[in-house]
């Protein structure tokens, strides 16, 4: 099954509230909810989380889940401490799943930037 995460940058609270209310109504009606949205207040906030290295980690994990941070660091040839920081940041916004080791559950990340 194809899974998509949606990143939103610069949306006002009203947009976030409308999206949450619509999801609440659908869930209350019994519809299964499989959406993942992350909202950033600014481009700078997004850029602070989604770096080039973290994007590379997501791509790697999408195709090669890892049993641990140490195993991931070895697989990509990077320092454990830096990989740990990257995994923490990406897991915090739900782009890395830690349920059974480390994996990237989404095959697509879509971004909407408000100007």
Give the residues covered by each predicted segment.
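General nucleic-acid-binding
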Residues: 1-28
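Short alpha-helical segments that sit at the start of domains
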Residues: 28-55
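Short, cationic-aromatic polyanion-contact patches
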Residues: 44-53, 68, 101-115
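Hydrophobic residues on short alpha-helical segments
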Residues: 57-59
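A short acidic, leucine-rich amphipathic alpha-helix
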Residues: 69-76
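Basic amphipathic alpha-helical segments that dock to polyanions
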Residues: 72, 83, 87-93
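A short, conserved structural fragment
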Residues: 91-101
């Amino acid at each position: 099954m194809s899974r998509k995460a949606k990143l939103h940058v610069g949306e006002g609270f009203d947009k976030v509230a409308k999206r949450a209310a619509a999801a609440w109504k659908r869930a209350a009606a019994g519809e299964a909810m499989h959406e993942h949205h992350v909202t950033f207040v600014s481009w700078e906030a997004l850029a602070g989380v989604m770096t080039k290295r973290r994007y590379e980690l997501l791509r790697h994990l999408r195709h090669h889940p890892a049993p641990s941070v140490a195993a991931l660091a070895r697989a990509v040839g990077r320092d454990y401490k830096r990989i740990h920081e990257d995994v923490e940041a990406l897991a915090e916004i739900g782009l890395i799943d830690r349920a059974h080791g480390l994996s990237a559950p989404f095959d697509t990340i879509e971004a909407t930037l408000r100007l």
